[in-house]
Amino acid sequence: METATLVAISISGLLVSFTGYALYTAFGQPSEQLRDPFEEHGD
């Protein structure tokens, strides 16, 4: 394969991996440990 194709596939894979990890952190098991500043600050 060409170098440009491998670079494009690598960057795309990293982007998909980062997005998946971000979604897992936001909505998965670790999300229970996140604090909600809006709930802490009652008006």
UniProtKB/Swiss-Prot annotation:
TM annotation in the entry:
5-27
Key words of the record? Chloroplast, Membrane, Plastid, Thylakoid, Transmembrane, Transmembrane helix
The lineage's top-level taxon is Eukaryota
Pfam families given in the database record: PsbN
Q: How does it sit in the membrane?
A: Single-pass membrane protein
| Gene Ontology cellular component terms for the protein in this record | chloroplast thylakoid membrane
* Gene Ontology biological process terms in this record: photosynthesis
Q: Is Iron-sulfur there in the keyword field?
A: no
Q: Does the keyword Thylakoid apply?
A: yes
The chain's disulfide connectivity reads none
- Cellular localization per UniProt: Plastid, Chloroplast thylakoid membrane
InterPro entries xrefs: PSII_PsbN
Q: Which PANTHER family match?
A: PROTEIN PSBN
Q: What does this protein do?
A: May play a role in photosystem I and II biogenesis.
Q: Which family does it belong to?
A: Belongs to the PsbN family.
Any idea what this protein is called?
Answer: Protein PsbN
Lineage at the top is: Eukaryota, Viridiplantae, Streptophyta, Embryophyta, Tracheophyta
- The encoding gene is psbN
